[in-house]
Amino acid sequence: MSVPTAAKRITTRQLRMRTPDEPIVALTAYTAPIAGLLDAHCDLLLVGDSLGMVIYGMETTLPVTVDMMIQHGRAVMRGSQRACVAVDMPFGSYQEDERQAYRNAARIMAETGASCVKLEGGAEMASTVAFLVERGIPVMGHVGLKPQSVHGHGGFRTVGRGAEAEQVMADAQAIAAAGAFTVVIEGTLEPVARAITEALPVPTIGIGASPACGGQILVSDDVLGLFSDFTPRFVKRYAQLGPIIEQAAAAYASEVRARTFPAPEHCTGMPAPDGRPA
């Protein structure tokens, strides 16, 4: 009798070797049920620090903690079997120095079982990326618009104009040279993101960047139409689940108030209309 084997996860090495004719499909995931639904369709699931805004209603990602990332990372790992799972390193968990970054990254990897971590930053973070990679922790880079630096950016705005274009390019090249297996490019002018993609030896993953990127990522709640407070231009909604959820809640509330739910078929031992026990 054969015993079914669990699906093998996509590895960071496999993602690094992806060619332009096989784009990387990535979405964020924060919970086990959503991870389970997305798993078969995604190469990469990112447990993003965007959960602070999407799940917890925070105004920015800055208050997110390592403990929060670990709890959601565990949930996504339990809910998925196939996709490579990356966990964001939150603000303040890696910027101090390489050793702080290693302690927190190692803890995230050990306690979640995820395949890699993602951190924001450019050339100033290259030594940190190298430090982690040399110690066996795969790293995704993140350049362009960096949400953890939202105050320094002057808000959530597209980057890559004028001298910024050269800086974003230099940042991406430094992170790739340091050993990142892929680099996320966020909120960057399309020609700049395209040029970076063509210049790097590793795949890029775009979000509000360019169709030329080696892959694309979006926040799953945006894709599903669940998060309506703010919709960036680069978001495409593939479903509108928000109104469906509201309709279901309204129908439930109506039946409870009308005392039509629960009905006999939803109860145990309650006589049916014909008098027989249910």
Curated annotation (Swiss-Prot):
Required cofactor names: Mg(2+)
Q: SUPFAM superfamilies attached here?
A: Phosphoenolpyruvate/pyruvate domain
Q: Which GO terms describe its cellular component?
A: cytoplasm
Q: Which UniProt keywords apply?
A: Cytoplasm, Magnesium, Metal-binding, Pantothenate biosynthesis, Transferase
Q: Name the residues that bind 3-methyl-2-oxobutanoate.
A: D49, S50, D88, K118
Reactions it catalyzes = 3-methyl-2-oxobutanoate + (6R)-5,10-methylene-5,6,7,8-tetrahydrofolate + H2O = 2-dehydropantoate + (6S)-5,6,7,8-tetrahydrofolate
Task: Relay the cofactor remark from the entry.
Answer: Binds 1 Mg(2+) ion per subunit.
Q: Does the keyword Cytoplasm apply?
A: yes
Indicate where this protein is primarily found. cytoplasm
Assigned protein family = Belongs to the PanB family.
General function of this protein: Catalyzes the reversible reaction in which hydroxymethyl group from 5,10-methylenetetrahydrofolate is transferred onto alpha-ketoisovalerate to form ketopantoate.
The molecule here is called 3-methyl-2-oxobutanoate hydroxymethyltransferase
